[in-house]
A protein has these predicted regions:
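TRNA-recognition modules of translation machinery and tRNA-sensing kinases, especially anticodon-binding
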Residues: 1-204
Length: 204
């Protein structure tokens, strides 16, 4: 979305800019249950909105969308993954923690240990998940600015009567996210844990 806006000069318009899109996408990863190689992605973007109110607005919009589609058996989970400064200390703490379990991690996470240990927290391998249960949480490493931003997001959601739970294990799979991240997770037994939607802030 950002590339399209730059290409067509849309950033010349007044900020914040809001847009929506639907497009076919492809995953460069091994297909899994509920995660196909090709899929359609519907999304919304808000550019030029640094306020935590913008994060809450996107989450409220997603909540309303699911409600109008009649999809109610979902749990909204939120987290903050901070800024690059926060994550530097967090990554170091994770590397120190997971190094003690290196022989028990899956092959992919052994590689992640050196490149991006945050991704180990998001691994779907059952052994890695068990090890991650006692791993350090990013919330404990947030700087003052990121902590206030997250507190404000929660206040906006509370004022909008949006139910949520904080899940410190949400890191999302894309490295450009900063501060707020969220996921809508299926609660029914057949699809428990399936992420039906999600996103987050990215301050480029």
């Amino acid at each position: 979305a950002a590339r399209a806006m730059l290409q067509h000069g849309i950033f010349n318009d007044a900020l914040p800019l809001k847009m929506t899109y639907i497009t076919p996408c492809y995953r460069y990863e091994k297909p899994q249950s509920g995660r196909y190689r090709e899929f359609y992605q519907f999304g919304v973007e808000m550019f030029g909105a640094p306020s935590p109110a913008a994060d809450a607005e996107i989450i409220c919009l997603a909540t309303t969308l699911f409600e109008r589609l009649g999809i109610s058996n979902l749990s909204l989970e939120i987290n903050s993954i901070g800024c690059p400064t926060c994550r530097k200390n967090y990554q170091a703490a994770l590397k120190n923690y997971f190094s003690a379990y290196k022989n028990e991690l899956c092959e992919t996470c052994v590689k992640r240990l050196e490149k991006n240990p945050m991704r180990i927290v998001d691994c779907k391998n059952s052994d890695c998940q068990k090890i991650s249960q006692n791993a350090p949480n990013i919330i404990d490493f947030l700087c003052e600015d990121c902590r206030k931003h997250f507190d404000d997001v929660k206040k906006y959601l509370d004022n909008s009567n949006i139910e949520y739970k904080i899940n410190p294990k949400i890191v999302r799979g894309l490295d450009y996210y900063t501060k707020t991240v969220f996921e809508f997770v299926a609660k029914d037994d057949a699809q428990r844990g399936l992420v039906c939607g999600g996103g987050g802030r990215y301050d480029g």
